[in-house]
């Protein structure tokens, strides 16, 4: 693997590692109901997506995001001026990189977060640890958790969050835009046979995504069917097993498509990989890291992958 490729993939794996921590993540059942009763003249009670009752100061003026997808959502809702801090991995849009950094998503610096005096800290159940939430609450900081598992969940979550943050109109407009774009893609793919794909998280060891993950649902919306059938979120398996599955395409998430193609050229020279038809025929789809982030670029990720797997459906040459 090239050094640039390794660096890029390491960024994506940080999100996966939080899931692999198992019981360390938020483990409460998800709910979507928002309660509108006022807890005090200055606060309002909400039920977040893991069923916790959260009191949040109103109107919300200062927000800290502990997930790249949530940072992107805040920008999409026009709330970037209220974003006072985010993580080291919050790099989209470009302006997000200029925000005050509070460390990583898994182990943020609590002192840095507290110093920003946020009205609310936003987290994602599958990414941020329960210990982080508890530590913030002990500091008297409100924490609101999201918990999307599918494309539909992501859209509903963004709409719900817009209401919590006082940007319902912007949320409604964002949701309408995303649903229209997805509907256009679905219409073009109507009647098209799904491609058998393997989403590659890592090559050494070989790692993919399980059938219940958000990414697996993105694949379905893009006219793809994962050849990996696993209840685990991020299953690891042998190269021999991958060769046996013989996917039509290998799908990679990277901002450096040329780097991935060079890596595949190198893989083609290795024993085992050279037996995989997708490698021999260079059936490789490279999409942006938007596919890894359950946020406002989700429709973009679906369309980007769909165009590569089914160019004829979009009037393009294969």
Give the residues covered by each predicted segment:
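A short, structured surface patch at a secondary-structure boundary
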Residues: 43, 61-116, 120-127, 132, ...
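Short secondary-structure boundary segments
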Residues: 67, 125-126, 201, 231-234, ...
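Short helices/loops that flank or line small-molecule/ion binding pockets
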Residues: 110-117, 139, 238-246
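Extracytoplasmic substrate-binding proteins
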Residues: 43-46, 52-53, 119-120, 130-207, ...
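Bacterial N-terminal signal peptides
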Residues: 14-27
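N-terminal hydrophobic or amphipathic helices and topogenic motifs
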Residues: 12, 27-61
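His/Asp/Glu-enriched short active-site or ligand-binding loop at hydrolase and phosphoryl-transfer sites
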Residues: 87, 212-235, 254
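Bacterial N-terminal signal peptides that target proteins for export
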Residues: 3-16
């Amino acid at each position: 693997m090239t050094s640039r490729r390794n660096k890029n993939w390491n960024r994506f794996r940080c999100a996966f590692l939080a899931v692999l921590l198992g019981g360390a993540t938020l483990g409460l059942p998800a709910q979507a109901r928002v309660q509108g009763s006022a807890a005090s003249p200055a606060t309002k009670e909400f039920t977040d997506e893991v069923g916790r009752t959260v009191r949040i100061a109103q109107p919300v003026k200062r927000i800290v995001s502990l997930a790249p997808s949530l940072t992107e959502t805040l920008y999409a809702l026009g709330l970037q001026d209220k974003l006072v801090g985010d993580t080291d991995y919050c790099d989209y849009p470009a302006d997000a990189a200029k925000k005050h950094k509070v460390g990583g998503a898994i182990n943020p610096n609590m002192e840095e977060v507290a110093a920003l005096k946020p009205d609310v800290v936003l987290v994602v159940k599958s990414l941020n640890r329960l210990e982080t939430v508890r530590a913030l609450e002990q500091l008297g900081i409100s924490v609101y958790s999201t918990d999307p598992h599918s494309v539909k969940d992501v859209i509903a979550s963004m709409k719900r969050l817009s209401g919590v943050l006082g940007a319902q109109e912007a949320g409604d407009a964002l949701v309408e835009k995303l649903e229209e774009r997805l509907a256009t893609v679905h219409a073009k793919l109507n009647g098209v046979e799904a491609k058998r794909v393997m989403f590659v998280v890592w090559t050494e060891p070989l790692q993919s995504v399980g059938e219940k993950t958000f990414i697996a649902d993105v694949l379905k919306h893009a006219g793809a069917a994962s050849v990996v059938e696993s209840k685990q979120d991020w299953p690891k398996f042998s190269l021999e097993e991958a060769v046996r599955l013989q996917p039509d395409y290998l799908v990679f998430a990277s901002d450096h498509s040329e780097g991935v193609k060079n890596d595949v050229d190198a893989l083609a020279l290795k024993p085992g990989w050279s037996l995989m038809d997708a490698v021999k025929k260079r059936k490789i789809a490279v999409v942006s890291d938007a596919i890894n982030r359950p946020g406002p670029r989700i429709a973009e990720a679906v369309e980007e992958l769909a165009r590569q797997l089914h160019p004829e459906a979009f009037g393009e040459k294969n």
